[in-house]
From Swiss-Prot:
Listed name of the protein: Secreted LysM effector slp1
Record lineage: Eukaryota, Fungi, Dikarya, Ascomycota, Pezizomycotina
Phenotype of the disrupted gene, per the record: Leads to a significant reduction in virulence and a reduced proliferation of the fungus in plant tissue.
Subunit-level organization: Forms homodimers.
Domain notes: The LysM (lysin motif) domains are small globular domains involved in binding chitin in eukaryotes. Slp1 contains 2 LysM domains.
Known glycosylation sites: N48, N94, N104, N131
Additional remark text: In plants, chitin acts as a microbe-associated molecular pattern (MAMP) that is recognized by lysin motif (LysM)-containing plant cell surface-localized pattern recognition receptors (PRRs) that activate a plethora of downstream immune responses.
Pfam families linked: LysM
Length: 162
């Protein structure tokens, strides 16, 4: 872009010189843009990791990771699992793989039938993590006191029979 003329603007006694652009023969910008995604990297799941955390660490999307790894439930990843993570995908997808929220589900599919309690867990939070009703989780764990969950305690997750 070249500046060929100068226009003077006056505002209540203030003068300012503003350059005026004149068209040049430069080529117009291309109408199509290309995207080059980043590499796919291996990531080992660590304590307290979720797909949200992993996706934020590696500039990816929850569903980009879930789809590449054929995860049946993106809300559950196993500690120590090695995930393939597409870094900097052209389209970051954080929603297409997520089930519609419902607190009435009595069972789930595609996950382990067991869950190990971690710090801060409650029956409500575990039920929410697996998209289950609290009643269904309690029914699968007769004898477990939901108010006295212990770190590393293993509880049952109700699995749907297909």
């Amino acid at each position: 872009m070249q500046f060929a003329t100068i226009t003077t603007l006056l505002f209540a006694g203030v003068a300012a010189a503003m350059p005026q652009a004149t068209p040049t023969s430069a080529a117009p910008p291309s109408a199509t843009s290309t995207c080059t995604p980043g590499p796919v990297v291996d990531y080992t799941v660590q304590g307290n990791d979720t797909l949200t955390i992993v996706s934020q660490k590696l500039n990816s999307g929850i569903c980009n990771i879930a789809t590449l790894n054929n995860l049946a439930n993106p809300n559950f990843i196993a500690l120590g699992a090695v995930l393939k993570v597409p870094t900097a995908p052209c389209v970051i997808d954080n929603i297409s793989c997520l089930a519609k929220q419902s607190d009435n589900n009595t069972c789930v599919s595609g996950v382990s039938p067991y869950y190990t309690i971690v710090s801060g867990d409650t029956f409500f939070l575990v039920a929410q993590k697996f998209n289950l009703s609290v009643d269904a989780l309690q029914a699968a764990n007769v004898g477990a006191d939901p108010l006295l969950l212990q770190l590393n305690q293993v509880i049952n997750i109700p699995i749907c029979k297909n």
